[in-house]
Swiss-Prot record:
Thermal profile of function: Optimum temperature is 50 degrees Celsius.
Positions with a binding annotation for Zn(2+) 2: 65-66, 208, 264
Cofactor: Zn(2+)
Active site, per annotation: 65
The encoding gene: rnz
UniProt keyword terms in alphabetical order: Endonuclease, Hydrolase, Metal-binding, Nuclease, tRNA processing, Zinc
EC numbers: 3.1.26.11
Name of the protein in question: Ribonuclease Z
SUPFAM superfamilies listed in its UniProt record: Metallo-hydrolase/oxidoreductase
Subunit structure: Homodimer.
Described function: Zinc phosphodiesterase, which displays some tRNA 3'-processing endonuclease activity. Probably involved in tRNA maturation, by removing a 3'-trailer from precursor tRNA. Also shows activity toward a broad range of substrates, such as intron containing pre-tRNAs, 5' extended precursors and non-RNA substrates.
Keyword Nuclease applies: yes
Pfam family, one: Lactamase_B_2
Amino acid sequence: MIEVIFLGTGGIKPTPERNVPSIAIRIGSEIVLFDVGEGTLRQMEIAGLNPMRIKRIFITHFHGDHYLGLAAIIQTMNLWDRRETLHIYGPENSGEFISNFLKSGYFAPGFDVVVHEITGKARLQFENYEIWTFEVSHGIPALGYVFKEKDRRGNFDLEKIKSLGLTPGPWMKELEKRKIIKIGERVIRLSEVTGPKKRGAKVVYTGDTEPIDDIVEFSKRADLLIHEATYISSEHRKDSYHTTIEEAYEMFKSSKARHLALFHRAPRYSYQEYAVAAKELCPEAYVPRDFDRVFVGGMGNVIFKVR
C-alpha cells in the first residue's frame, strides 16, 4: 500500500485556504514528489514529511504554480548536507529552466542534480515502482504521470508446497531471496509454490490539461485518478487549456478508474462552493483539501483520511 499526501490542491496562486499544486507519494521510506508549487517545503513541514527522503521529483510543466517551490527544497537539502543525487523529471526544456533557476542568487548545491527531459510516452523503471508518462494538452510542453507500484508476489501456498513433497522450512526464506533454488536434485522456482501476484497500486496525475483521449487510456484500471478540474463551468474556463468538473467526470467514467479526486481548483472558488458543485455534477468524486491523505492498495483498496 502507498500513501498519497495532498500538499497543495489549488491552482494558479495560493489562497488563505489552500496552496498551489504538489502531491507526495510515500512508498516505503521514499517520498516521490509530483509538482512543487511555491510553498511546498512549508507544506511538507506541516505534513511531517522529510525532504531528504525525496529521490525523484516529477514536474508536469513549467508554469510557476507547479515548480517555483523547487529552489527552497534543494537549498534545504543542501543545508542538511545531502550527498545523494536528486533526479528531476519534466517535459522538454526542463534542463534549461532548472539550470537557470539554480544559478539565481548566491547558491550552488553540494550534491548532484540530474535533470531528465521526457518527450511523449515513456516507461521508467525503479526498484519498487514504475512511472509512465504521456503528453497532455496545455498550450506548452506538459506531461501527465502514472505512478504504478510493482506487483508483489503471492503468499506461499501450503497445498502447492505439499504437492511437491516438501514441508515448510528455512528453504522458503532462501527461495524468496534467490527466486530459484535446488533441493536435492530438484529445482524449485518461487512461482511454483506461491499464489497469484498481488497487483500494485496505480495512481494517475494529469497535471494541467484539456480533456484528451490519452487520459482515458492511461487511467484504465487506476485505483485513483487525480484529474485537474480548475473550473466549475465552461463559462468560467473560456479558452484556457483546462478542464471543468463535468469534463473530468467524463474522463473518469470512460476510463473506469476506481476513484476520482478533483484537483487544481481556481482561486475564485471557496472549498465549500466547489465541493457543492462537484457533488451535483459528479457525486462519486472526492474533492481533497491540503494535507488530506489517501492510502492506496491494489485491487481498488483505497482509504481516504481527510483532515
